[in-house]
């Protein structure tokens, strides 16, 4: 029995002492005046009576009622029922009411009445003051309190003849039962009657309707969020204008938390004066009036629930973990069925007529039942995870959190983890974990209804029925007697508060009330206490939680087969069948990723320990330790699956004998795991073992098990009693035992705990002390690092005390082991553990002190034992490891560091790792890493014995290293943590290595330093290309690039010194200039041939330099420059010639200028430059000042058809053309005084414009009226037959087309440029393409003859950043979290590499269009050596078929990249000075663009895709000197540019990549494209949209059998033995073999048919003893035979056969058959669209075309008999006319044949080249063609006569001369 009310208080309004606008509450009277002993009077009650503050009102408000809750220091709750009414203010009372205070007032109570506004100031006589009647009770009977206080108020207001003192006295003396379902009727002496019902079980909360109201106000989702927030200890704040609703909401939320009790701050109604409580750091559930909502806005970590608005606001910084699935969705569905039953019927065709909805009270219980089911599902089986540590004198119970989470597979679940770590669950364990107590509904539910709930999950109606059954029980608990007599309580009238004749509430007589209270107290003392006996029983445990399969196990869900493999392997180990065990070991290690296999291993090992088979030999010991380490490596610090618990007794049992008296146990080899350094693991293990021994203590010997059994899991057999059952029985018997027996049991339990503490001190010392105790740090410091890709040793973990540092912070764990010895750290760790577990287990202080004394001795003894073990273990013979495989080295390649044993680990690539991806497990591989002067090489063999004896090779050039990172990884064999290195290269290779344990840290560091030294040498002369095969003489110190270079005189001297050293040692020929054949232009000359090209002394002084003649020394330099690629190409293009007399017609628009021969104007330009004829050399110096790096515009290519020129330069300076354009429309005095450089620049550009034939006659206006339609015809090739030929106008301004993010916005969907017809008829003669940022604000004048085209281009740093992302996408360092093709494509897209390729192709194609339409283009971007080079190279490649040959592409690279100064050394970071800048793949990006074009036009390129990969590999490898240094100037300074000219070709090593390519091309067709069938004058227009681009396989391919295939000498492995060499008697073996894409080199093991036949032919020739024929000659002969055969059979013409030989979608849109020599063309068009084809219909146009155009019409394939062919005009014999003939140059027969027509089979004549004496330029004679340039004539002088020839243009003539001379030189 308990008092219904403890105190009655009368509180009234009083003025504030500081005189502020608000008043304060004053307690007028309280009864009883003296505090109860068991319940003191709560302080601050006047604040809670008026939570919004004590304020006056201008009118009478109706009375209000609410119940506030106060919590005392003992966490006991007091319920304060407050009834407030208003009385007029007496005139004598001082009232202070300022306007400011009134403005701030908003509401006086929770009822929501209006406040006094500032517009109606109240007179003192009109104000009303609040007065409150308060009942304070420990019981929650709100309705009784409302009725009782209402009765007192009614007596006062209505003036009833009842004594208030008597009523209040009866109220304070009334007693009611606490629980048990009893019913009591009370009366307060005023004719009233009230019935009080107590709940059946007081542990179940009483909610009335609060839960249902909460769901109605907030909804399902919001309430679930608040529920999770309260459980995970977040701050929850309710807002409402009603205090009663605030109280009900808080009550409802607490009811939902049952069976957990909320133990933090709980204030349903918080007074305004205490709002600062909201800033407390601890969790809370608080209700605040909505009037103070503004003051809660700044709370950053508080979840606000607005009851009136129905919203829940969660701050961004707060994360509420949701319920784990499927509980979240299941709970939501059941709540929907309860709250909205009509939802299930809404879609029925014939819904039932009526649905009976539950009452509000019953719905409240149904909602609570849903959450009760939720907790039963969440906590099912929790009693099986309780550890009973002590039974007497009081139960001590601990919860095994890790086992509970592990059973459910919810270790990673944030919600459940936080719930189990919270204070509410700790209270739940201490309260409900007791085995012998009273039970309630939750205990029955979790013990007996779990199976039913699981069966009902898929049946919603059965779930709802169960919910209703539980709701009935909850309702019956609150209302045990349904038929309750009605209350009878006097109520005041409805408008009683408005009466004016109110009298104030009277002062009560204290004496009367106190007398009534004293009388009742005296009666209570004499009566016996009526206490209902509590029914206690054994709490049922219910079924154990069945093991849930690991949710994240993926492919490792263990099957019976995997467990069988584990058992077999262990059997083989203990039976000594080590070879069989070794074969099974990799499969076992993979299977041990699953929990079942790990438990199986522990069980099998335990069986062998029981059979006394724990002493092993060395090999058995190693196998067992490896399997244990594999088990433990996946154990978290929690050990949620009990694997470490099961292995702990085993690691102290298995051992091996090292020597007599010295035994090594397994624990010394499994210490490197984080679980051993986790205090929670040791505590759980300790409590589990103590429970086992306590249980054995109380079991009869016949019932139990021996105390020596080690248990990690609870026993679940039906015939055995659990520890909780034993404890329950003992607690039941405890009161019946004698005092002595009780004391004996207490001592036995304490002795058990004490002995286990000693036992665990020993165990912990075993696993914490390292084998080598002399180490200065603990082994555990490295545990748990995993495969972190950083060199940091810091540990970061979320698990509590999961690391050394964190465990120290949580009052356990190691201190910083660097500052103390190992023994001291272990002693402190063990002492903290002992303190914690012994204090919690109730061990006496004496025993605890004894333990502290014993721990240091235990540790010291173990250290002494370990010293002997460590000493003997060092004497063990080392495990025999695989023999190191020596790598194959290049000639001249030397080993810098011999092999260091490493493991090559799998990176993020899926190939080669086996498993689910398929294929053999080639990685991880065991071997060694070698560092040579050229490469980093790994050679080894896979660790998986099932793969076989496959050699794994992975290497890359040292110069290609881009990133080196130290990592810490687990070795794949012994699962130990080792230091490692991750090396990434720009050749798209990755070496992820873990050093073997025998490799010391010093050796690893030496390897890293040597690698760094080789990667970044101090000088370029220390690179492999220079040190290979030559001992160069050290020159002067390396030039510092930042210095201002030497003077012109010094530079000239240096240049001449190097030129004389390399060229001058040969005599200078005095013959006229005869250009060498194209076959030998770029090669060192034959040994017996002089290789000088001299400029004759007959030079005219005014032809090359406008001011003075060349000096003799300059002429030697000039002759060297003439040989360079630039000059050779200029002569081919007709841009300028250095003929015998160097005389040029003045009509030639361009000339070769030697102004930069000493590199005085621009060091990054070549020595000879093409400039307009009219520009003098002295003006070029001034022009160069307008451009960055002095790189002024020079011509680099000229269109043979439109005569438009392509120019390149650096970006413009501010005073260049930009300045002119900005000021051109506003004349001013400053404009007249323009800078001379700008004027010279303007003249220069004007000269370029004037050099174009069709613009030369125009007077400053680019009117194109004379521009014929023939020039607008399409002469290009599209990359698809289906290309649309729609004409698409792009607006009137090229600049606006190019400007913007997407550069060109064309309507073509595939990214193709518009057709030629898109250009407007009136366009500029010259387009200057520049950077948009540089040309910002420029408005070109349409009257100008050039036009600026501002575009947005990427910078070098963007290329570098994009390349880094591309590297990580193609060669990731670690496996993707979601391995799928989409993840690779997403990474590829994020790199933006293909977007940059797209932009480059798009700009290039547009420039091609402009050039093809007759406009010249100047590309002037950045400094002119990166993007500019990429664009101009691509433009020439697309426009000129010559550059698509092997020789032409070489010439293109030499000219545009090498001679024009691309900074290869700077962009490739070749030296230490460039280390900070890093690698920028500008040239590689260009090669990728060429690869994209090659894919779309495979028949237009003479070279193969492999050639591009070869260049991409070797431009970074530094094997050759070709791609070193930044300009010709630097190469001359080092003496490199001409050094190969004087050397002989017989050397072993090639210094030039081109020489290497030439040598290989003669031996193998690897660089040749068999589908090569070019069409001259083809302008390629590739599609450039990202969707049309492909990822280059250079980035992704892998050849683990031999490494990268780009070093040909290394890629050629030993030949396979012939079939006849099989051993005698051997069975015939199949020649079939498995080809692994990531292992084998597919071109070698699966060669294409042509290569295979060529190899076979060569082999047969060798067998027959015949000299082998070159493959190219064989191929040419085969093609000629094919052509001859097709001609004889009449199956078609050669050109059509060539087209049909390859997929025709790669061909042009038209196929042409020539009917006569220059006659009309018959078009067989594949598409009717004329704008996309290459057709012409007029023979007049055909006659005017260049020779290359005619060549495409007469084209056939190359053959043995047709080395070169084309049309030449030949003058007949004496007095015979000139006539066009078809000439064929035959290298094989060494003759020049001519035919009347191309199709003729019989020749008209033959010129034997053996009789030719000279080939010289000729002069026109009578009857020669009129339209041909005089330089197109040449003569062939033989021993018999002189033949006069005429080509159709100068380049064709030069080509014929070169070809004929090439044949002569080869003879």
UniProtKB/Swiss-Prot annotation:
Biased composition (Polar residues): 705-715, 1260-1269, 1281-1290
Residue(s) carrying Phosphoserine: 1120, 1746
Keyword 4Fe-4S: no
Pfam families xref list: DENN, GRAM, Myotub-related, PH, SBF2, uDENN
Cited InterPro entries: cDENN_dom, dDENN_dom, DENN_C, GRAM, Myotubularin, Myotubularin-like_Pase_dom, PH-like_dom_sf, PH_domain
Phenotype of gene-disrupted mutants: Viable. Approximately 30% smaller than wild-type control animals. Males are sterile. Significant increase in the proportion of bundled axons with a diameter of >1 um. Significant increase in unmyelinated axons that are in 1:1 relationships with Schwann cells. Significant decrease in the percentage of bundles containing between 11 and 20 axons. Bundled nerve axons were incompletely enwrapped by Schwann cell processes, as evidenced by direct contact of axons with basal laminae. Number of axons per bundle not markedly changed. No impact on Mtmr2 protein levels in sciatic nerves.
Residue ranges constituting the uDENN domain according to the UniProt record: 7-184
GO biological process: regulation of cell growth; spermatid development; spermatogenesis
Start and end residues of each dDENN domain: 338-439
Residue ranges of every copy of the cDENN domain listed in the record: 203-336
Stretches assigned to the Myotubularin phosphatase domain: 1120-1596
Chain segments carrying region Disordered: 102-121, 702-725, 1065-1092, 1260-1318, 1605-1633, 1723-1752
Start and end residues of each GRAM domain: 880-968
GO molecular function: guanyl-nucleotide exchange factor activity; pseudophosphatase activity
Top-rank lineage group of the source organism: Eukaryota
Matching Gene3D superfamilies: 3.30.450.200, 3.40.50.11500, Pleckstrin-homology domain (PH domain)/Phosphotyrosine-binding domain (PTB)
Subcellular locations according to the entry: Cytoplasm; Cytoplasm, Perinuclear region; Cell projection, Neuron projection
Its job: Acts as an adapter for the phosphatase MTMR2 to regulate MTMR2 catalytic activity and subcellular location. Promotes the exchange of GDP to GTP, converting inactive GDP-bound Rab proteins into their active GTP-bound form. May function as a guanine nucleotide exchange factor (GEF) activating RAB28. Acts as a suppressor of autophagy in neurons. Together with its binding partner, the phosphatase MTMR2, plays a role in dephosphorylation of phosphoinositides critical for autophagy initiation and autophagosome maturation.
PANTHER family per record: MYOTUBULARIN-RELATED (PTHR10807), MYOTUBULARIN-RELATED PROTEIN 5 (PTHR10807:SF43)
Domain notes: The C-terminal domain mediates interaction with MTMR2.
Identification of the protein by name: Myotubularin-related protein 5
Source species of the chain: Mus musculus (Mouse)
Gene designation per UniProt: Sbf1
């Amino acid at each position: 029995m308990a008092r219904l009310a403890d105190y009655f208080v009368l509180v009234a309004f009083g003025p504030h002492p500081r005189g502020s606008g608000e008043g304060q509450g004053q307690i007028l009277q309280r009864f009883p005046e003296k505090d109860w002993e068991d319940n003191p009077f709560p302080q601050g009650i006047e604040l809670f009576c008026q939570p919004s503050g004590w304020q006056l009102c201008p009118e009478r408000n109706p009375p209000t009622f609410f119940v506030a809750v106060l919590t005392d220091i003992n966490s006991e709750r007091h319920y304060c029922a407050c009834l407030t009414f208003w009385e007029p203010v007496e005139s004598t009372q001082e009232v202070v009411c300022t306007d400011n205070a009134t403005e701030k007032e908003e509401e006086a109570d929770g009822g929501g009445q209006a406040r006094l506004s500032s517009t109606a100031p109240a007179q003192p006589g009109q104000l009303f003051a609040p007065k409150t009647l308060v009942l304070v009770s420990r019981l929650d009977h709100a309705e009784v309190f409302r009725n009782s206080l209402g009765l007192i108020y009614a007596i006062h207001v209505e003036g009833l003849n009842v004594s208030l003192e008597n009523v209040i006295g009866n109220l304070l003396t009334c007693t009611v039962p606490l629980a048990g379902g009893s019913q009591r009727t009370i009366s307060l002496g005023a004719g009233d009657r009230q019935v009080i019902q107590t709940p059946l079980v007081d542990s179940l909360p009483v909610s009335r309707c609060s839960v249902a109201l909460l769901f109605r106000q907030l909804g399902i989702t919001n309430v679930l969020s608040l529920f999770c927030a309260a459980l995970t200890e977040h701050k929850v704040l309710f807002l409402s204008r009603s205090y009663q609703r605030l109280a009900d909401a808080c009550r409802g939320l607490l009811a939902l938390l049952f069976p957990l009790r909320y133990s933090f701050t709980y204030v349903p109604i918080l007074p305004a004066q205490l709002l600062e409580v909201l800033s407390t750091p601890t969790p809370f559930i608080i209700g605040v009036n909505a009037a103070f909502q503004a003051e809660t806005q700044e709370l950053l970590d508080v979840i606000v629930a607005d009851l009136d608005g129905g919203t829940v606001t969660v701050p961004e910084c707060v994360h509420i973990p949701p319920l784990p699935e499927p509980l979240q969705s299941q709970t939501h569905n059941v709540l929907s069925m309860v709250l909205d039953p009509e939802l299930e019927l809404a879609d029925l065709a014939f819904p039932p007529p009526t649905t009976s909805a539950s009452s509000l009270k019953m719905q409240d219980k149904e909602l609570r039942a849903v959450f009760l089911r939720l907790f039963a599902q969440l906590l099912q089986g929790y009693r099986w995870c309780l550890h009973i540590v002590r039974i007497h004198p009081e139960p001590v119970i601990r919860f095994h959190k890790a086992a509970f989470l592990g059973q459910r597979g919810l270790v990673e679940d944030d919600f459940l983890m936080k719930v189990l770590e919270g204070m509410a669950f700790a209270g739940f364990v201490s309260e409900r974990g007791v085995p012998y107590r009273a039970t309630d509904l939750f205990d029955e539910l979790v013990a007996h209804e779990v199976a039913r709930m699981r069966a009902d999950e898929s049946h919603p109606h059965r779930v709802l029925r169960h919910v209703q059954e539980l709701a009935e029980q909850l309702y019956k608990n609150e209302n045990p007697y349904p038929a309750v007599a009605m209350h009878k309580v006097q109520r005041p009238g409805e408008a009683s508060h408005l009466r004016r004749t109110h009298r104030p509430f009277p002062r009560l007589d204290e004496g009367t009330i106190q007398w009534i209270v004293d009388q009742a107290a005296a009666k209570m003392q004499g009566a016996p206490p009526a206490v209902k006996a509590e029914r206690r029983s054994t709490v049922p445990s219910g079924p154990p939680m069945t093991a849930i399969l690991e949710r994240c196990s993926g492919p490792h869900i263990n099957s019976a087969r995997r467990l069988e493999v584990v058992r077999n392997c262990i059997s083989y180990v203990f039976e000594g069948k080590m070879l069989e065990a070794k074969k099974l070991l990799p499969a076992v290690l993979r299977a041990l990723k699953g929990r079942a296999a790990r438990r199986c291993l522990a069980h099998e090992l335990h069986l062998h320990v029981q059979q006394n088979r724990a002493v092993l030999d060395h090999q058995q010991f190693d196998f067992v330790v490896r399997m244990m380490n594999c088990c433990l490596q996946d154990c978290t610090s929690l050990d949620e699956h009990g694997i470490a618990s099961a292995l702990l007794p085993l690691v102290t049992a298995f051992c091996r004998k090292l020597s007599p008296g010295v035994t090594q146990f397994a624990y010394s080899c499994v210490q490197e795991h984080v679980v051993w350094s986790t205090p929670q693991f040791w505590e759980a293990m300790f409590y589990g073992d103590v429970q086992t021994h306590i249980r054995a203590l109380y079991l009869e010997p016949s019932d139990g098990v021996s105390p020596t059994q080690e248990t990690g899991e609870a026993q679940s057999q039906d015939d055995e009693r659990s520890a909780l059952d034993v404890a329950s029985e003992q607690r039941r018997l405890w009161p019946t035992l004698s005092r002595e027996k009780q004391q004996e049991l207490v001592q036995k339990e304490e002795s058990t705990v004490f002995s286990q503490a000693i036992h665990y001190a020993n165990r912990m010392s075993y696993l914490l002390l390292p084998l080598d105790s002399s180490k200065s740090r603990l082994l555990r410091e490295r545990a748990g690092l995993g495969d972190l890709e950083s060199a940091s040793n810091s540990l970061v973990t979320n698990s509590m005390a999961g690391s050394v540092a964190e465990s120290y912070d949580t009052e356990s764990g190691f201190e910083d082991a660097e500052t103390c010895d190992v023994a001291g750290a272990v002693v402190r760790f063990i002492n903290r553990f002992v303190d914690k577990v012994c204090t919690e287990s109730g061990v006496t202080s004496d025993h605890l002190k004894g333990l502290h004394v014993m721990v240091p001795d235990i540790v010291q003894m173990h250290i002494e034992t370990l010293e002997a073990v460590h000493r003997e273990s060092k004497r063990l013979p080392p495990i025999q490891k695989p023999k190191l495989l020596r790598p194959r080295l290049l000639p001249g390649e030397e080993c810098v560091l011999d092999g260091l044993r490493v493991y090559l680990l799998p990176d993020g690539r899926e190939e080669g790792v086996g498993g689910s991806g398929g294929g053999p497990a080639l990685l991880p591989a065991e071997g060694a890493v070698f560092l040579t002067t050229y490469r980093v090489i790994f050679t080894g063999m896979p660790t998986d014995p099932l793969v076989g004896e496959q050699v794994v090779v992975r290497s890359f050039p040292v110069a290609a290293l881009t990133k080196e990172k130290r990592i810490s990884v687990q070795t794949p064999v012994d699962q130990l943590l080792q230091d490692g290195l991750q090396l990434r290269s720009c050749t798209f290779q990755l070496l992820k290595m873990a050093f073997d344990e025998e490799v010391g840290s010093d050796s690893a560091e030496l390897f890293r330093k040597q690698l760094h030294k080789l990667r970044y040498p101090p000088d370029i002369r220390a690179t492999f290309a220079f040190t290979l095969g030559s001992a160069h003489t050290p020159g002067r110190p390396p030039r510092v690039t930042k210095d201002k270079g030497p003077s012109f005189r010094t530079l000239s001297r240096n240049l001449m010194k190097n030129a004389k050293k390399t060229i001058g040692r040969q005599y200078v020929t005095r013959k006229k200039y005869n250009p060498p054949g194209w076959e030998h232009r770029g090669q060192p000359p034959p040994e017996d041939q002089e290789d000088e090209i001299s400029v004759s002394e007959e030079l005219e002084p005014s032809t090359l330099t406008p001011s003075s003649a060349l000096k003799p020394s300059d002429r030697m330099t000039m002759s060297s420059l003439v040989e360079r690629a630039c000059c050779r190409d200029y002569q081919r293009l007709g841009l300028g010639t250095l003929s015998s007399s160097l005389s040029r017609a003045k009509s030639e628009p361009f000339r070769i200028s030697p102004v930069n021969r000493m590199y005085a104007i621009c060091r990054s330009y070549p020595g000879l430059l093409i400039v307009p004829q009219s520009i003098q050399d002295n003006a070029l110096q001034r022009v160069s000042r307008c451009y960055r790096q002095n790189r002024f515009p020079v011509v680099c290519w000229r269109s043979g058809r439109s005569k438009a020129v392509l120019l390149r330069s650096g970006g413009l300076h501010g005073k260049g053309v930009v300045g002119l354009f900005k000021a051109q429309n506003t004349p001013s005095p400053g404009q007249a005084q323009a800078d001379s450089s700008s004027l010279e620049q303007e003249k220069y550009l004007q000269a370029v414009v004037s050099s174009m034939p069709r613009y030369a006659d125009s007077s400053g206006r680019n009117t194109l009226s004379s521009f014929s339609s023939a020039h607008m015809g399409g002469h290009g090739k599209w990359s698809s037959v289906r290309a649309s030929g729609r004409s698409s106008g792009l607006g009137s301004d090229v600049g606006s087309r190019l400007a913007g993010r997407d550069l060109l916005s064309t309507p073509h969907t595939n990214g193709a440029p518009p057709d030629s017809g898109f250009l407007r008829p009136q366009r500029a003669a010259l387009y200057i393409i520049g950077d948009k940022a540089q040309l910002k604000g420029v408005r070109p004048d349409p009257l100008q003859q050039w036009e600026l085209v501002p575009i947005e281009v990427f910078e070098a740093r963007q290329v570098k950043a994009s390349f880094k992302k591309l590297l990580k996408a193609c060669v990731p360092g670690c496996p993707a979290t979601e391995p799928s093709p989409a993840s690779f494509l997403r990474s590829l897209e994020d790199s933006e590499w293909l977007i940059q390729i797209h932009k480059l192709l798009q700009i290039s194609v547009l420039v091609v269009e402009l050039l093809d339409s007759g406009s010249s283009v100047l590309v002037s971007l950045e400094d002119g050596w990166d993007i500019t080079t990429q664009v101009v190279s691509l433009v020439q490649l697309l426009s000129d078929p010559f550059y698509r040959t092997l020789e032409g592409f070489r010439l293109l690279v030499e000219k545009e990249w090498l001679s024009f100064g691309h900074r290869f050394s700077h962009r490739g970071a070749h030296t230490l000075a460039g280390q900070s800048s890093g690698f920028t793949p500008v040239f590689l990006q260009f090669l990728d663009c060429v690869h994209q074009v090659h894919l779309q036009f495979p028949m237009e390129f003479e070279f193969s895709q492999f050639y591009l990969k070869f260049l991409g590999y070797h431009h970074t490898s530094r094997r050759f000197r070709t791609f070193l240094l930044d300009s010709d100037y630097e190469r001359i300074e080092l003496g490199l540019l001409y050094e190969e000219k004087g050397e002989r070709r017989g050397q072993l090593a090639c210094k030039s990549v081109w020489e290497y390519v030439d040598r290989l091309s003669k031996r193998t067709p690897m660089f040749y494209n068999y589908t090569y069938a070019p069409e001259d004058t083809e302008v390629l227009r590739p599609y450039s949209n990202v969707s049309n681009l492909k990822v280059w396989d250079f980035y992704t391919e892998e050849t683990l059998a031999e490494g990268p295939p780009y070093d040909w000498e290394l890629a050629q492995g030993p030949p396979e033995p012939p079939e006849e060499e099989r051993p005698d008697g051997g069975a015939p073996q199949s020649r079939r073999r498995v080809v692994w894409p990531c292992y084998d080199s597919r071109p070698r093991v699966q060669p294409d048919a042509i290569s295979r036949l060529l190899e076979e032919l060569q082999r047969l020739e060798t067998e027959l003893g015949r000299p082998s024929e070159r493959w190219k000659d064989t191929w040419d002969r085969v093609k000629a035979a094919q052509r001859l055969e097709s001609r004889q059979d009449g199956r078609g013409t050669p050109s059509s056969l060539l087209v049909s030989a390859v997929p025709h979608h790669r061909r042009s849109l038209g196929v042409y058959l020539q009917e006569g020599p220059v006659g009309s063309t018959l078009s067989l068009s594949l598409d009717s669209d004329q704008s996309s084809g290459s057709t012409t219909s007029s023979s007049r146009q055909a006659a005017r075309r260049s020779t290359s155009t005619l060549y495409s019409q007469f084209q056939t394939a190359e053959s043995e008999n047709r080395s070169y062919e084309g049309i030449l005009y030949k003058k007949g014999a004496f007095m015979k006319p000139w006539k066009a003939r078809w000439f064929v140059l035959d290298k094989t027969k060494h003759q020049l044949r001519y035919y009347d027509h191309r199709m003729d089979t019989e020749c008209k004549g033959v010129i034997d080249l053996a009789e030719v004496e000279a080939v010289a330029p000729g002069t026109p004679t009578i009857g020669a063609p009129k339209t041909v340039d005089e330089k197109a004539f040449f003569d062939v002088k033989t021993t018999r006569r002189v033949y006069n020839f005429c080509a159709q243009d100068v380049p064709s003539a030069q080509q014929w001369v070169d070809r004929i001379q090439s044949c002569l030189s080869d003879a």
